[in-house]
Regions:
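Catalytic cores of alpha/beta
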Residues: 112-119, 282, 342-357
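Glycine- and acidic-residue-enriched helix-capping/strand-helix junction motifs
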Residues: 14-31
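Flexible glycine/acidic-rich beta-alpha junction loops that bind and position SAM and/or redox cofactors
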Residues: 12-15, 111-112, 197, 247-249, ...
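N-terminal [4Fe-4S]-dependent radical SAM core
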Residues: 9-18, 147-191
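Radical SAM enzyme core and accessory elements
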Residues: 3-5, 61-70, 382-385, 390-498
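Short, electropositive alpha-helical surface patch
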Residues: 59-60, 254-260, 344-362
Length: 498
């Protein structure tokens, strides 16, 4: 018996040019875990990664069919309105074979029955944490040649029973390293799953069905490292846990021990954690053991917004955490929702002052990131439900799994749209400039100009944000649109776009 794991294409769109919120980073290991589970069940395995593919539907389906799988399981990551492509591929597979067609991952878990209705050729979905479900499903499929109704399996026309979370993460197999992951010199690895937070914008607790963090035995983590480091050359580690540092003294000591493990491997590492897990002494210890980067989801510089989105942290805690990272010399990456749907213009300006106070608006890429992000609303999320109940959900029949929303203050929405377009122009322009730098290494040209004008671009983005906020306070919408055009022209000129 053979299972084929498929990573679906994820085309880049202008509207979501710099968005990564369609899946948590932990999803990068999903296919590897599925393949490892199947191998333990005695199944032949194959992985087809079309994440960056530009093939058409017919060619994609032909490659999948050529593998001769008994089950084809799509790790279906939401691709910003391009779901029709996967639906077409599924229809071709269904017409030309008797293969069982399934999907798993965050997007299928959130979308569930709506996805089964959208993709009528899809036979089943593995909802939520899937490893034990798949481990139980494969032997039964070998015996019966059909997908059994099991906890964690959503079948068309059948009632669904959820599966309990895995009690001991140490029993998980070592994931295969496949697809795009093999092209990176950094190794993604998980020391825990889940998060004790319940932020309203986050999908993690929806995926697992609870706000709970589970850790694995460190001996199993060390075994996984030994196995995966023996497969290929690795330059660094990245811990993809939603929150690397847990609560309490024991969890802080555990984080320190993981740092010592990374040091014994001779590898620098990065991680993500909640603000309330940070203290400077621990960060200094981690830095001493090789920590080079940390991602903090601070999300806002307003206590009122932090309360609305259920962050359970304060701006003072954020200040302390950011300064602790800065003092330890660890590279800081930030999650920030500038345009929270209920924001006021005053809160936007408060956010700006907060970021300036902490010295976070000094580098153009980070400035562009921090001054433009709004909240992503996908089908099945808490935000979809809440905006729907308030009559604020803006649906588009072309995008059945993604929605916009009405800002409580329309002027905030105007500034958000303007900054979104300006920063999209910036990121797409910088991509082109960097590509030209790589293609013509001996021609300084635009690449050198982009480097030289970095300070000017940074100042321009900041000035645009403040000017748009001030204009939205007192002027009609047309004035905001006119101002956006002025700044777009300045941005084009500064970057020397042709």
């Amino acid at each position: 018996m053979k299972i084929v794991i498929v990573e679906n294409p994820r085309p880049l769109t202008l509207e979501h040019y710099n968005d990564v919120a369609n899946a948590p980073l932990s999803a990068s290991l999903n296919s590897g875990y599925a393949l490892a589970v199947a191998s333990l069940a005695g199944w032949e395995t194959a992985c087809l990664d079309f994440s960056t593919s530009k093939l058409d539907e017919e060619s994609t389906a032909a490659i999948i069919l050529a593998e001769g799988g008994d089950i084809v399981l799509f790790h279906w990551v939401y691709s910003w309105g391009h779901e029709e492509f996967v639906r077409s591929v599924l229809e071709m597979l269904s017409r030309n074979s008797n293969v069982a067609l399934g999907a798993f991952g965050l997007f299928p878990t959130l979308a569930t029955r709506n996805l089964l209705q959208f993709a009528s050729s899809l036979d089943f979905i593995l909802a939520g944490e899937f490893e034990e479900t798949l481990s139980e499903l494969l032997p039964l499929f070998t015996e019966r040649r059909t997908v059994a109704a099991l906890p964690g399996v959503l079948l068309r026309g059948r009632s669904y029973v959820s599966r309990r979370l895995i009690a001991d993460l140490s029993l998980l197999p070592v994931p295969d390293d496949v697809g795009a992951n093999c092209g990176y010199t950094s190794l993604n690895i998980a020391a825990s799953r889940g998060c004790y937070g319940a932020c309203s914008f986050c999908f993690i607790h929806r995926y697992y069905g609870c706000s709970r963090r589970r850790v694995r035995d460190l001996a199993s983590l060390e075994r996984e490292l030994e196995t995966r480091l023996s497969r290929r050359d690795i330059a660094s580690l990245y811990f993809i846990d939603p929150t690397f540092i847990g609560q309490g003294g024991d969890e802080r000591e555990r984080a320190s021990e993981i740092g010592r493990l990374a040091r014994r491997c001779g590898l620098p590492f990065g991680f993500e954690t909640r603000v309330d897990g940070v203290d400077e002494e621990l960060l200094a210890t981690l830095a001493g053991n090789g920590a080079t980067s940390v991602f903090l989801g601070i999300e806002s510089g307003c206590d009122s917004v932090l309360r609305r989105i259920g962050k359970r942290i304060s701006t003072e805690q954020i200040r302390c955490a950011v300064r602790s990272v800065q003092n330890c010399g660890i590279e800081l990456h930030l999650g920030f929702i500038m345009f929270e749907p209920d924001s006021t213009l005053a809160e936007l300006e408060e956010n700006y002052l907060f970021l300036e106070e902490l010295g976070l608006l000094d580098q153009r890429d980070q400035t562009a990131n921090l001054l433009y992000h709004n909240q992503i609303v996908l089908y099945g999320s808490a935000a979809w439900e809440s905006f729907g109940s308030e009559g604020r959900l803006l649906l588009d029949e072309r995008l059945p799994f993604e929605a916009r929303y009405r800002f409580r203050d329309e002027r905030v929405g105007q500034v958000c749209a303007a900054m979104g377009r300006l920063t999209s122009h910036y990121f797409s322009a910088m991509t082109g400039i960097r590509q030209s730098r790589s293609a013509v290494a001996d021609d300084c040209g635009a690449a050198c100009h982009a480097t030289d004008c970095g300070g000017a671009v940074n100042s321009l983005l900041k000035e645009a944000f403040l000017s748009l906020c001030r204009t939205a306070h007192t002027q009609p919408p047309q004035s905001v649109a006119d101002l956006e055009r002025e700044y777009a022209a300045q941005l084009h000129g500064t970057l020397a776009l042709r």
